Amino acid sequence: MANVALLSAASPSTSSAAPRLRHVARRRPSRRSACPRSAASRLSIMAALGEDPIRQWILTEGKATKITGVSSIGGGCINSAQCYKTDASSFFVKTNGRIGPSMFEGEALGLKAMYDTNSIRVPLPYKVGSLPTGGSFIIMEFIEFGCSRGDQSALGRKLAEMHKAAKSDKGYGFYVDNTIGSTPQINTWTADWIEFYSKHRLGFQLELITQRFGDSAIYDKGQRLIENMHPLFEGAVMEPCLLHGDLWSGNISSDTNGEPVILDPACYYGHNEAEFGMSWCAGFGGEFYSSYFEVMPKQPGFEKRRDLYLLYHYLNHYNLFGSGYRSSAMSIIDDYLRMLKA
């Protein structure tokens, strides 16, 4: 496991771009979860006790001598988000009063891995830690967003550059398990992509559905697909590329110069085509794909595999939000079983 504590050494003064406002913590609008205790109340308690590790880091490693303001920023119910303004720069802080540092450690490792490719802009993580009142926090770079999601052509090209630049000699997986939304995402290193995707993506989601909803019908059909999907990959050259992992419209923006920004990842090393699994709510258009495939050429059978990668996210949405997503997932499974005559 990589040492997340080392991220604290990446102070704002060593970053290639100074932190900017405004980086918003966002998840899918429909995501439902019990909201954590008010971030403002937690922070005020810590301040009163003089035990605020966020302020301590900002006023030491963050190179600030004074915090000039703290304000809440719109976000979802998984985490709370705050803007810390200082005399040195501004910082984006996410807190969670119920979950320990492991969730943010996974996010920080993913952000740092993407940042190190020098391809597409992501917020640089600075520090992950525990809160004395319970829970955890992550401090990272602020990025001031522009007025739009940016140029689709530039997004496609830079995403492909990231996939091309970052490969793993460990196989498919990641340094730690992380989360996709609030669902655990298992990233055990695996040499073979089909095995990894079968076991740790489709298989894991199907098992969760069975445990939570008792849906043996979708489980049984899903297992038949897993056992028979090898022909979908014939002729494709696959390498373990660094993926954002949760690339939907809420995790895509642009900075004030119009350059694409991606955030809130669920990173792992996987087949590059799996990055398009959230395309059903990402808004990728023709310009995006044309620019992407200029850098990362389209592999034989791409169209046949596209829905296979959508399936993982439909199954996850079934687990997160309930049976409203069941029919979409089952339709994909049934179509593949007919195609494969399985």
Swiss-Prot record:
Binding sites annotated in the UniProt record for ATP: 141-143
EC number per UniProt: 2.7.1.172
Pfam families according to UniProt: Fructosamin_kin (PF03881)
Entry annotation: catalytic residues: 246
GO cellular component: chloroplast
Cellular compartment(s): Plastid, Chloroplast
Domain of life: Eukaryota
Entry annotated with the keyword DNA-binding: no
Function per UniProt: Initiates a process leading to the deglycation of proteins. Phosphorylates low-molecular-mass and protein-bound erythrulosamines and ribulosamines, but not fructosamines or psicosamines, on the third carbon of the sugar moiety. Protein-bound erythrulosamine 3-phosphates and ribulosamine 3-phosphates are unstable and decompose under physiological conditions.
Designated name of the protein: Protein-ribulosamine 3-kinase, chloroplastic
Native source species: Oryza sativa subsp. japonica
Lineage, highest ranks first: Eukaryota, Viridiplantae, Streptophyta, Embryophyta, Tracheophyta
